[in-house]
Structure formats: C-alpha cells, structure tokens
C-alpha cells in the first residue's frame, strides 16, 4: 500500500513525500 506524508523541507516549505 502506498502512503503519503507531508513533511517540511529545510527552507520551511511543505512538500508531499511518497513512501512505501
């Protein structure tokens, strides 16, 4: 199953990361 999580980058922006 593929899950997704929202993590903050070093510059402070929010990016959507996909992980298995």
Curated annotation (Swiss-Prot):
Superkingdom, natural source: Bacteria
Record GO terms (molecular function): hydrolase activity; metal ion binding
Biological process per Gene Ontology, one example term: glycerol biosynthetic process
Functional pH dependence: Optimum pH is 7.1.
Alphabetized UniProt keyword annotations: Cytoplasm, Hydrolase, Magnesium, Manganese, Metal-binding
Cofactor(s) demanded: Mg(2+); Mn(2+)
Pathway note: Polyol metabolism; glycerol biosynthesis
Enzyme's top EC category: hydrolase
UniProt cofactor note: Manganese is efficient to a lesser extent.
Compartment(s): Cytoplasm
GO cellular component, one term: cytoplasm
Enzyme Commission code(s) on record: 3.1.3.-
Quaternary data: Monomer.
Name assigned to this protein: D-alpha-glycerophosphatase
């Amino acid at each position: 199953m593929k899950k997704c999580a929202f993590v903050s980058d070093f510059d402070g922006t929010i990016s959507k990361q996909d992980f298995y």
